[in-house]
């Protein structure tokens, strides 16, 4: 399959990756279709040459399966934890790129009640103003 068109959607990311110190990426779908070994276009590179001044870049990746942290020195992700019901194997099988994996990977801790209250309250309400369909799907009736 040859991709010839570059589609919109990542307009600000190239700039933000240089100036925002800790960019946290999130994607609910965690499959090898989404997390491929090689992409057709790079909108915002995760790393750069040594002589390029850069304050920001990717910090973490949160998916429906796990939490990963980006290592700028190694220019790759490291698995930090797997969500309930997932395993290192299920994450690996559904990831098309190489990532570091420590010998012991814990389960992602569940959020505390006060965090859930804020997420389901003021954050969900604010999110619904810009992304109503997403907020409805994630939080239900707001």
Predicted feature residues:
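Conserved phosphate- and dinucleotide-binding cores of soluble alpha/beta proteins
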Residues: 4-104, 111
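A conserved C-terminal secondary-structure "cap"
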Residues: 103-142
């Amino acid at each position: 399959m040859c991709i010839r068109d570059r589609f919109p959607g990542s307009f600000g990311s190239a700039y933000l990756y240089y100036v925002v110190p800790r960019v946290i990426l999130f994607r609910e779908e965690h499959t090898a279709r989404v997390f491929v070994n090689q992409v057709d276009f790079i909108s915002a590179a995760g790393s750069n040459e040594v002589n390029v001044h850069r304050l920001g870049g990717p910090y973490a990746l949160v998916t429906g399966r796990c939490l990963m942290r980006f290592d700028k020195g190694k220019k790759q992700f490291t698995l930090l934890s797997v969500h309930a019901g997932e395993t290192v194997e299920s994450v690996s099988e559904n990831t098309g790129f190489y990532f570091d994996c420590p010998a012991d990977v814990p389960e992602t801790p569940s959020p505390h009640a006060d965090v859930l209250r804020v997420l389901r309250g003021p954050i969900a309400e604010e999110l619904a103003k810009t992304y109503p369909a997403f907020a409805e799907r994630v939080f239900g009736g707001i």
